[in-house]
From Swiss-Prot:
Gene of this entry: nadD
Organism, scientific name: Dictyoglomus thermophilum (strain ATCC 35947 / DSM 3960 / H-6-12)
GO MF: ATP binding; nicotinate-nucleotide adenylyltransferase activity
InterPro entries attached to this UniProt entry: Cyt_trans-like (IPR004821), NadD/NMNAT (IPR005248), Rossmann-like_a/b/a_fold (IPR014729)
Similarity-based family: Belongs to the NadD family.
Name assigned to this protein: Probable nicotinate-nucleotide adenylyltransferase
Enzyme class: transferase
Lineage per the UniProt record: Bacteria, Pseudomonadati, Dictyoglomota, Dictyoglomia, Dictyoglomales
Amino acid sequence: MKIGILGGTFDPIHYGHLWFAEYARERFKLDKVFFIPNKIPPHRETPLATSKQRYEMVLLATLSNPCFEVLPIELEREGISYMVDTIRDLSSCFSFDELYLLLGNDAFRDFLKWKEPYKIIEKASIIVGSRGIEDYSSDLKNFIKNFENKIFFLDFPYYPISAKEIRERVKRGLSIKYLVPESVEDYIIKNGIYL
């Protein structure tokens, strides 16, 4: 089986995440995409929504796609959510499967600053939602060259929205329709998140 892994704070999950996951799934013929909300993200600000709220929003957003599955493994683990630990756990559970880590261009740009990036690439290939490698550091360009058989660039139609923009719109009382699935919008409103 070919499994995609999309980690993130998902604060909140939005159509950009879903579109990237679906586009990568189709393009690379992935059987499943696991959405993995972080508990304590090492490279981002602390999420505003609780772990439970973010998990439930991801569940709601992915419910209609049988190829999408939400795994709470980082939420259940103590401490900072390092992807190397998640990949290690998944590779032991899915030892005969191919793992593909899905990363946006911004996350990939900082990949060498992550905890044990070489352990990650040893166990999983990487699919980068990107337009090319022109703006990467020389270290990252060398890394790409050394692992060119495990790093793939996916030129996909970019969905120009951010979770930060969505949170700001909610706080200002503006619509988030067409930015998040309706079920997620309803959940945010019902629970008064981001106000």
